[in-house]
Swiss-Prot record:
Gene Ontology annotations of biological process type: adenylate cyclase-activating G protein-coupled receptor signaling pathway; intracellular signal transduction; melanin biosynthetic process; negative regulation of tumor necrosis factor production; phospholipase C-activating G protein-coupled receptor signaling pathway; positive regulation of cAMP/PKA signal transduction; positive regulation of transcription by RNA polymerase II; sensory perception of pain
Keywords: Cell membrane, G-protein coupled receptor, Glycoprotein, Lipoprotein, Membrane, Palmitate, Receptor, Transducer, Transmembrane, Transmembrane helix
Record-linked PANTHER family: G-PROTEIN COUPLED RECEPTOR
Protein's name in the database: Melanocyte-stimulating hormone receptor
Topology Extracellular: residue spans: 1-37, 94-118, 184-191, 267-279
Superkingdom: Eukaryota
Family of this protein: Belongs to the G-protein coupled receptor 1 family.
Organism the protein comes from: Ovis aries (Sheep)
Topology of this chain in the membrane: Multi-pass membrane protein
Cytoplasmic compartment spans: 64-72, 141-163, 212-240, 301-317
Transmembrane regions: 38-63, 73-93, 119-140, 164-183, 192-211, 241-266, 280-300
Length: 317
């Protein structure tokens, strides 16, 4: 696996290899004495990966076990868990191999290690793309269920959901292979950043519109019950808090990584940008944290899923 300065995490090639279409080079030692670098120990990476691995395996197992959860919405949540599971597996695998190599327990040729690193890079990149796609799919599914409630079951059918899921996985794998193969082209980085911005905008527009509709519905109920002010304010605050958490977690966990990719194109030699480049490991750790938080936001809030999860933990299959 490529060792580039202090950064030895997945997608390291995107971190320090400049785009070939522009004469860009990253200057590793021009960040100045006040540059803050957050060191992420391998043990922490391994711990985060294992926690995420256990969480998302439980989500997949619970949805697979309970037939009441075999619906398009839960299939999207299950696929999101599988995407996060790939992030966890890739992280655990890479960290374990790195620790074994550093300890001298595992001895292999550099070419083999490089091939393993390429495979892991494809896994992590495809999991990132698919995770973003399924987050968007969940938002669209919820939007349709609110604004087209009467037509929901005719619009979001199981065959259609399966086709969407298959298309997302195929597109994610192709995108990851192309991204890793042509990582040194500016257009690849810009496409990845543009994809993130598009998904962020899609989720923000849909969830804000859903919140506005929910508040409007709450006001209507309040007027009928002649208790407009207390109900509306309480519901609006709760909805705004939920929306802030949902979009805030998404932006905080994914934003720094895609900011990093943007700066590789915009200012690869600027000292300030160099400070940001030095924290690449931190940005990847935040993505793993997102894989831990996703089940808490999208899966474990379901009472039916929590009940099934208890049965899974008790091994009562």
């Amino acid at each position: 696996m490529p060792v580039l300065g202090s950064q030895r995490r997945l997608l390291g090639s995107l971190n320090c290899t400049p785009p070939a279409t522009l004469p860009l080079t990253l200057a590793p030692n021009r960040t100045g004495p006040q540059c803050l670098e957050v060191s992420i120990p391998d043990g922490l990476f391994l711990s985060l990966g294992l926690v995420s691995l256990v969480e998302n395996v439980l989500v997949v197992a619970a949805i697979a076990k309970n037939r009441n959860l075999h619906s398009p919405m839960y299939y999207f949540i299950c696929c999101l868990a599988m995407s996060d599971l790939l992030v966890s597996v890739s992280n655990v695998l890479e960290t374990a191999v790195m620790l074994l190599l550093e300890a001298g327990v595992l001895a292999t040729r550099a070419a083999v290690v490089q091939q393993l690193d390429n495979v892991i890079d494809v896994l992590i990149c495809s999991s990132m793309v698919s995770s973003l796609c399924f987050l968007g799919a969940i938002a669209v599914d919820r939007y349709i269920s609110i604004f087209y409630a009467l037509r929901y079951h005719s619009v979001v059918t199981l065959p259609r959901a399966w086709r969407i899921i298959a298309a997302i996985w195929v597109a994610s794998i192709l995108t990851s292979v192309l991204s890793i193969t042509y990582y040194n082209h500016t257009v690849v980085l810009l496409c990845l950043v543009g994809f993130f911005i598009a998904m962020l905008a899609l989720m923000a527009v849909l969830y804000v519109h859903m919140l506005a509709r929910a508040c409007q519905h709450a006001r209507g109920i309040a007027r009928l019950q002649k208790r407009q002010r207390p109900i509306h304010q309480g519901f609006g605050l709760k909805g705004a808090a939920t929306l802030t958490i949902l979009l805030g977690v998404f932006f905080l966990c994914w934003g720094p990584f895609f900011l990093h990719l943007s700066l590789i194109v915009l200012c690869p030699q600027h000292p300030t940008c160099g400070c940001i480049f030095k924290n690449f490991n931190l940005f990847l750790a935040l993505i793993i944290c997102n894989a831990i938080v996703d089940p808490l936001i999208y899966a474990f809030r379901s009472q039916e899923l929590r009940k099934t999860l208890q049965e899974v933990l008790q091994c009562s299959w």
